[in-house]
């Protein structure tokens, strides 16, 4: 049973790491924005801070880079706006949990 947990933890970690290293599909205007803001990208955005204007500028966490997660907010006037924040995706949280559990058992 322990071997199965270790193998599953390794697979989840590898899959999560490979998906976090891949570049998300960039639109042309986002790519131009990234090139124009090269200096501001060097200062990363901490977890739970707004990343609406710089969607690829989130800092790294313990194991993975935080992802800019966006939601659509509807105001009382009925106007929709997009708000984004740096956070840990659920599959990264699961991988960190498994690794932390493995460290407690083996280490």
UniProtKB/Swiss-Prot annotation:
It comes from the Eukaryota. Its main location: secreted. Residues 21-41 form a propeptide. It is found in: Secreted. One of its GO terms (cellular component) is extracellular region. Keywords: Disulfide bond, Knottin, Secreted, Signal, Toxin. Residues 1-20 form the signal peptide. The keyword Lipoprotein does not apply. It holds the Pfam family Toxin_35. The presence of a 'disulfide through disulfide knot' structurally defines this protein as a knottin. This is U1-lycotoxin-Ls1b. It comes from Lycosa singoriensis (Wolf spider). The lineage of its organism: Eukaryota, Metazoa, Ecdysozoa, Arthropoda, Chelicerata.
């Amino acid at each position: 049973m322990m071997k199965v947990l270790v193998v599953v933890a390794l697979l989840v970690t590898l899959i999560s790491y490979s998906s976090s290293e891949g570049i998300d599909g960039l639109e042309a205007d986002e790519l131009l924005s990234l090139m124009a803001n090269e200096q501001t990208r060097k200062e990363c955005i901490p977890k739970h801070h707004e990343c609406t204007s710089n969607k690829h500028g989130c800092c790294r966490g313990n194991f993975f880079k935080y992802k800019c997660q966006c939601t659509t907010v509807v105001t009382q006037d009925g106007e929709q706006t997009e708000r984004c924040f740096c956070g840990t995706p659920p599959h990264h949280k699961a991988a960190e949990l498994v690794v932390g559990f493995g460290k407690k058992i083996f280490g």
